């Protein structure tokens, strides 16, 4: 009688060859579920071995989901899950009453006598649940494709499907348990030994800028780095310089260590790929962007441009200029790039142009979702993520224009989620807009101040979770949007560092 009460869920699948509807039973193993539950009721300690990966929704039978959930709750209360305690918890449940629950629990215990390794049964149940989820995703993809409005692009649906499949593939893989401290110490010692052998002590990805590396020790895997600044400070230009430097430095290191070459990903949500590439060419060939756009080039400059273009073309540098991407789309594309091109570092220009997944009217909540998503990408893909950010207009209302953490737009969540927060600030930009009249007595004083900050960009490290904060100064050539070490004798071509 009890067995007849257990349901079999059936899917109707259409055969494309003859248009016949063929009923197919969803994959499950009722007996494995019964034997595992019986074994846990008999020996509650077994729950600890399967609860790390097995949840109640992984069971196919609804009554088995209820029994497993009840077992977990009883044990969490410090009690023993027995037929008696389970009965007291489930006695009011309609399904438990329908299948004559007390008799059914006795049957489960009887069946458990044949169990040799309960963990194997748990893995069977888990694997079948994943297959059912895969079927559900497939049905959802088909239904969405049939029912989607013209406003929903096919590419967006593909990314949604890919994200669902990727999440399903990783289900259970990220559920880490405790690590014995000896293992963690061994990993730490390995990192320390590696750093000791490195003469410049840059243990992350080198930025190519000496003073910045001395502060940050390079960009580190799983870190979220926020680079913020007011308009015209040069944050996009700085990001392009960093992307180019890290791309070249990763390549050299990978070749030296005989490893697969890592790539740079650059999400340009504001600037087109062509505009970004023009900046790269201007930077490397040292030809101003205006000359490149107008085509007013001498033969010598054009030959130099072709040479740098050929060098750039060989780099593992990838640009995505799709506007208004959602955080889920960025995650999906970054995952894809990790699989296909061994993504080593990711740049995003800029944070406020990313759409959240949930439709929140509260921008602070949406930014929180985005920054948490970016940090999750950094951890999941084990790469540094550098996201550019705007600053509030409050900076312009102060006499001292140097930015502070409180100037970050929707600052609370950005500051909280970031491992490093850097500001770019150029005093030269503000001074040039305050030039006194030529004959004015203050003009000489103004000129002296301007000379001290000419071609200098300050990088203010306002937050550094694992290191010192402070300011550094960099050389900045606005004509070519080029950053380098402050002492010009150490300022070489980006591609030749």
UniProtKB/Swiss-Prot annotation:
UniProt domain SF4 helicase: residue ranges: 198-490
Entry EC number(s): 5.6.2.3
Domain of life assignment: Bacteria
The keyword ATP-binding belongs to this UniProt entry's keyword annotation: yes
Listed InterPro entries: DNA_heli_DnaB-like_N_sf, DNA_helicase_DnaB, DNA_helicase_DnaB-like_C, DNA_helicase_DnaB-like_N, DNA_helicase_N/primase_C, P-loop_NTPase
Pfam families per the UniProt record, alphabetical: DnaB, DnaB_C
Class of this enzyme: isomerase
Gene3D superfamilies: DNAb Helicase, Chain A (1.10.860.10), P-loop containing nucleotide triphosphate hydrolases (3.40.50.300)
Coiled-coil features, chain-numbered ranges: none
GO molecular function, one term: DNA binding
Residues bound to ATP: 229-236
GO cellular component, one term: cytosol
GO BP annotation list: DNA replication, synthesis of primer
Keyword Transmembrane: no
Subunit note: Homohexamer.
Function: The main replicative DNA helicase, it participates in initiation and elongation during chromosome replication. Travels ahead of the DNA replisome, separating dsDNA into templates for DNA synthesis. A processive ATP-dependent 5'-3' DNA helicase it has DNA-dependent ATPase activity.
Protein name listed in UniProt: Replicative DNA helicase DnaB
Organism annotation: Rickettsia typhi (strain ATCC VR-144 / Wilmington)
The organism's taxonomic lineage, starting at the top: Bacteria, Pseudomonadati, Pseudomonadota, Alphaproteobacteria, Rickettsiales
């Amino acid at each position: 009688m009890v067995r007849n009460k257990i349901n079999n869920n059936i899917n109707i699948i259409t055969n494309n060859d003859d248009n016949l509807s063929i009923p197919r039973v969803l994959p499950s193993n009722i007996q494995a579920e019964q034997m595992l539950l019986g074994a846990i009721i008999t020996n509650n300690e077994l729950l600890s071995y399967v609860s790390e990966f097995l949840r109640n929704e992984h069971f196919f039978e609804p009554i088995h989901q209820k029994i497993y959930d009840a077992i977990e709750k009883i044990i969490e209360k410090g009690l023993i899950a027995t037929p008696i305690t389970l009965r007291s918890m489930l006695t009011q449940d309609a399904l438990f009453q329908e299948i004559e629950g007390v008799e059914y629990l006795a049957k489960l215990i009887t069946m458990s006598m044949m169990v040799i390794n309960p963990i194997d049964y748990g893995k069977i149940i888990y694997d079948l649940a994943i297959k059912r989820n895969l079927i559900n995703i497939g049905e959802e993809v088909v239904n969405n494709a049939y029912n989607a409005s013209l406003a929903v692009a096919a590419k967006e649906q593909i990314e949604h499907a890919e994200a669902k499949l990727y999440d399903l593939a990783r289900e259970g893989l990220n559920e880490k348990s405790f690590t014995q401290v000896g293992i963690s110490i061994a990993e730490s010692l390995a990192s320390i030994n590696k750093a000791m052998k490195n003469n410049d002590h840059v243990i992350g990805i080198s930025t190519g800028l000496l003073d910045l590396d001395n502060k940050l020790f390079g960009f580190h895997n799983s870190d979220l780095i926020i680079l913020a600044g007011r308009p015209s400070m040069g944050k996009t230009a700085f990001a392009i310089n960093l992307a180019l430097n890290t791309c070249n430095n990763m390549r050299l290191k990978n070749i030296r260590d005989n490893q697969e070459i890592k790539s740079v990903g650059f999400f340009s949500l504001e600037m087109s790929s062509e505009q970004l590439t023009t900046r790269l060419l201007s930077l490397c060939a040292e030809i101003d962007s205006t000359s490149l756009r107008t085509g007013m080039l001498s033969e010598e400059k054009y030959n130099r441009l072709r040479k740098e273009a050929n060098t750039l073309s060989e780099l593992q540098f990838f640009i995505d200029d799709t506007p208004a991407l959602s955080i889920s789309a960025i995650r999906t594309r970054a995952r894809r790039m990790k699989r296909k091109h061994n993504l080593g570092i990711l740049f995003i220009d800029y944070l406020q142009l990313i759409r959240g997944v949930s439709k929140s009217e509260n921008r602070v909540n949406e930014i929180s979702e985005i920054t948490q998503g970016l940090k999750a990408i950094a951890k999941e893909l084990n790469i540094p993520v550098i996201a550019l950010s705007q600053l509030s207009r409050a900076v312009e209302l102060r006499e001292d224009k140097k930015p502070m953490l409180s100037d970050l737009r929707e600052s609370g969540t950005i500051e909280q989620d970031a491992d490093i927060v850097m500001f770019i600030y150029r005093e030269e930009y503000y001074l040039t807009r305050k030039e006194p009249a030529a004959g004015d007595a203050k003009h000489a004083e103004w000129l002296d101040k301007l000379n001290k900050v000419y071609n200098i960009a300050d990088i203010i490290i306002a937050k550094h979770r694992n290191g010192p904060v402070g300011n550094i100064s960099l050389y900045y050539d606005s004509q070519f949007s080029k950053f380098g070490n402050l002492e010009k004798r150490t300022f070489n071509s980006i591609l030749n560092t």
